[in-house]
C-alpha cells in the first residue's frame, strides 16, 4: 500500500492540514507544526491538539501517513556552540510537538558545517543532537532527509546518512527520507529504471531499507550532479516520469509517506492521481 500526498499548508490551524490533503486525493501528507521561519512558537493548546487528532481521524490519516517537517532554521551540526544549542532546543521542541500531536515521524535536514569544522565533526554533532532529543521524547522517530549538497550542507551522500545513523544510540528511532530531486542533484542517477535499480541498490547496501521512513517525490530543474536544489513538477524536469513510475511499482516503498514538494500546488491532485495510476497499472500487469 502506497501512501501518496503532498506538503500541505496548516494556515488557519493545524486541523486544516488533513482536510487540505483529503481535498487533493492524498493518502499521506506533510506539514509544519509551527511557523518554520521562526525559532519559537506558542505551545500547542489542548484544543489545537484535539482538533488536529479529530481531523486526522475524520479524514482517515494515521501517524504512519504523516511526515511533519521541522524548521529550516535548525542546524544540528552547527560549528558554534551557542548556535548549536539554540538549534538543539528548537529541534527538541519540534519533537515534543510531534509527540503531543500523536505523530511518530519528524523529517529534518541534517546540518551544515559552514566551512568551519571538518565534515566528520559535523556529522558527529548531528548524531549527538539526535541522541539528546531522543532521550527527552518518546515514540517519535528522527527522519534524516538527504540533501542536494548545496553550500556546506551535509547528508548528500548515502555514506553521510549512514555515519549519522551509526552515531545514534537508539537505532529504532532514527530513519531517513530520500528526496529524489536532492539525490539526483547530488549525483545519484534516477533517469531510467536501470539507474533507479543501481542507485537504490547502493542505498540498501550503505544505509539499509529498514531505515527508509519516507520520501519526497520531486523532479529536478537542476542538472545531474550539480549540487543545486531546484524542484520541478513530475515529468517536467531532468529526472523524468520513469523514476516515479518505478517507485510506484516497487514494494520497498510501501507503507511510508511519499510526499510531493513539486512547484505547482495547483496540479498536486493530478500528480497524486497519476502516481496512483502507476501503482494500479503495475498491479493489473
Swiss-Prot record:
One Pfam match, given by its short name, reads AP_endonuc_2
Q: How is the cofactor bound?
A: Binds 3 Zn(2+) ions.
Keywords of this protein's UniProt record, alphabetized?
DNA damage, DNA repair, Endonuclease, Hydrolase, Metal-binding, Nuclease, Zinc
Q: Which domain of life is it from?
A: Bacteria
The positions annotated for binding Zn(2+) 3 are: 182, 229, 231
Q: Tell me which residues bind Zn(2+) 1.
A: 69, 109, 145
InterPro entries reported for this sequence: AP_endonuc_2, AP_endonuc_F2_Zn_BS, Xyl_isomerase-like_sf, Xyl_isomerase-like_TIM-brl
Fetch the SUPFAM superfamilies from UniProt. Xylose isomerase-like
Give the Enzyme Commission number: 3.1.21.2
The terms under GO molecular function for this entry are: deoxyribonuclease IV (phage-T4-induced) activity; DNA binding; DNA-(apurinic or apyrimidinic site) endonuclease activity; phosphoric diester hydrolase activity; zinc ion binding
Is Protein transport set as a keyword in this record?
no
Q: Which residues bind Zn(2+) 2?
A: 145, 179, 216, 261
This protein's cofactor list reads: Zn(2+)
Reaction(s) catalysed by this chain, per the record, are: Endonucleolytic cleavage to 5'-phosphooligonucleotide end-products
GO BP terms: namely: base-excision repair
The record's NCBIfam families line, in alphabetical order, gives:
nfo, PRK01060.1-4
Annotated family: Belongs to the AP endonuclease 2 family.
* Function noted in UniProt: Endonuclease IV plays a role in DNA repair. It cleaves phosphodiester bonds at apurinic or apyrimidinic (AP) sites, generating a 3'-hydroxyl group and a 5'-terminal sugar phosphate.
Q: What is this protein called?
A: Probable endonuclease 4
Recorded source organism is Salmonella schwarzengrund (strain CVM19633)
Biological classification of the source:
Bacteria, Pseudomonadati, Pseudomonadota, Gammaproteobacteria, Enterobacterales
Q: Which gene encodes it?
A: nfo
